[in-house]
């Protein structure tokens, strides 16, 4: 199979499997949200957010670093992957122990504190799985990771439905999460060892070298993901979220919409992840080729981004009702606001990876630090008065600031300002939007399917998308 076909195959299979995984995840969230209600789902979400902060600290950019290092000529893949994998697990174990200790100092219900203890195992499984993605991307076998995720999500959904039917309560739902995450890790580890014999490795001198290389990336990731997650922590604390009668319920309301955001931004992360080795390859020895790949990737992301944003703006209420039930209809305005953040995140994925490829992580870290400080300050200003609406608005403003700063850095580095070809996608999106608005009372699945057909048909007719351009991106 040629490189063109391999990349195209991986994109299609991974995207398809990822869509199935997202669907399973959203169905699972629907069952859980209906079973637990606003406050119970808020507790469930808070546990995941709290632990994700410690997972973020353990990330250290090792996933991106592994992809870059094993893509280099003459790389010792076994030593690199085994040591980075082991380093990630060791650091995470230390931080998860700290998380278990720290949670008891927060003013949360006891079920949240016990839940954190249970879910630490799931976070360990998912974190270990994530770092293995570098292997699948190097060998263009991301379909294996996608299959593992689908199976794991199916396990979790099946157990959740069973436990809800048996009315086993809150902690049983958390157990289903742990089992699903364990299944994903076991499968990913099995698949990864077919290409690289990953083992536990303790080359401390190499660990020191990796930590030195990873520090700028790690700092950037920590800053980025903290401002992604800290809003839920602020919402959960009554002395900050002073306008709320039930801060934990507000976390549930906010996270129903946020789960949609996390689901739909898979495409840019997956697509840009496959393009990253090419950007890294051409970043220094063929800058013109780098610019071409960068521009074509940006064009594809804009084409996908526009209908997503418009669709979420118009279908926010039926989407949140479908996922969480009418009890969560108050989440619709949150999703409408976050739809703009989704558009910015699409662009930010490409810009962030390009900064790493251009070896500008240290400057990038200052950008993410600025974003984190801005996010924390604005959250502390707006959450006390506007609760989850303030949190969502702050997320959009932060993404806008970070995106603009990344564009400036990239332009100064490669002496090239990218073209934002949005006019034709916007025209096609407007046609799609008019259809959805006119038939808004129709079945949501019909609206999504027909809307997508209308969008791409109009885009093709006005020559906003060409098959040759997509193939050209892959070839380059």
Whereabouts are the PLM-identified features?
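Transmembrane helical elements of multi-pass membrane transporters/channels
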Residues: 10-25, 152, 176-180, 184-188, ...
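Membrane-interface junctions at transmembrane-helix termini in multi-pass inner-membrane proteins
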Residues: 69, 125-148, 171, 339-370
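Membrane-proximal transmembrane or re-entrant/amphipathic helices at the cytosolic face
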Residues: 437-476
């Amino acid at each position: 199979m040629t490189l063109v076909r391999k990349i195209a195959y991986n994109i299609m299979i991974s995207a398809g499997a990822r869509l199935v995984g997202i669907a399973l995840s959203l169905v699972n969230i629907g069952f859980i949200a209906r079973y637990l209600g606003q406050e119970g789902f808020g507790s469930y979400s808070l546990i995941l957010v709290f632990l994700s902060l410690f997972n973020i600290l353990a990330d250290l950019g090792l996933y991106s670093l592994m992809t870059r290092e094993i893509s280099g000529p003459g790389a010792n893949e076994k030593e690199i992957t085994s040591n980075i994998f082991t380093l990630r697990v060791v650091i995470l174990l230390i931080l998860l122990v700290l998380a278990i200790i720290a949670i008891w100092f927060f003013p949360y219900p006891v079920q949240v504190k016990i839940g954190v203890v249970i879910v630490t195992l799931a976070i360990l499984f998912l974190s270990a799985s994530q770092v293995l993605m570098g292997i699948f991307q190097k060998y263009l076998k991301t379909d294996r990771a996608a299959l593992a995720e689908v199976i794991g999500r199916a396990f979790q959904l099946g157990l959740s439905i069973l436990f809800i039917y048996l009315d086993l309560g809150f902690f049983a739902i958390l157990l289903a999460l742990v089992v699903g995450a364990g299944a994903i890790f076991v499968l990913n580890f099995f698949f990864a060892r077919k290409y690289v014999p990953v083992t536990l490795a303790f080359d401390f001198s190499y660990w020191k070298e990796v930590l030195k290389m990873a520090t700028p990336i790690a700092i950037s990731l920590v800053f980025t993901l903290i401002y992604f997650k800290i809003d839920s922590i602020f919402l959960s604390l009554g002395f900050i979220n002073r306008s709320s009668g039930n801060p934990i319920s507000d976390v549930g309301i906010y996270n129903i919409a946020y789960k949609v955001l996390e689901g739909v931004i898979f495409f840019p992360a997956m697509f840009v992840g496959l393009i990253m080795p090419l950007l890294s390859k051409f970043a220094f020895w063929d800058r013109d080729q780098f610019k071409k790949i960068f521009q074509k990737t940006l064009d594809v992301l804009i084409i996908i981004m526009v209908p997503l944003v418009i669709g979420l703006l118009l279908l926010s209420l039926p989407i949140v009702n479908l996922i969480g039930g009418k009890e969560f209809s108050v989440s619709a305005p949150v999703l409408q606001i976050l739809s703009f953040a989704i558009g910015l995140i699409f662009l930010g994925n490409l810009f962030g990876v390009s900064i790493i490829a251009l070896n500008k992580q240290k400057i990038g870290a200052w950008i993410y630090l600025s974003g984190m400080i801005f996010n924390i300050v604005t959250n502390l200003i707006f959450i006390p008065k506007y609760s989850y609406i303030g949190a969502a608005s702050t997320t959009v403003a932060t993404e806008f600031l970070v995106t603009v700063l990344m564009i400036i850095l990239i332009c100064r580095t490669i002496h090239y300002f990218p073209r934002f070809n949005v006019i034709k996608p916007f025209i096609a999106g407007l046609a799609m939007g008019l259809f959805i608005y006119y038939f808004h009372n129709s079945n949501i699945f019909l609206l999504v399917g027909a809307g997508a057909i209308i969008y791409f048909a109009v885009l093709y007719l006005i020559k906003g998308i060409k098959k040759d351009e997509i193939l050209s991106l892959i070839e380059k």
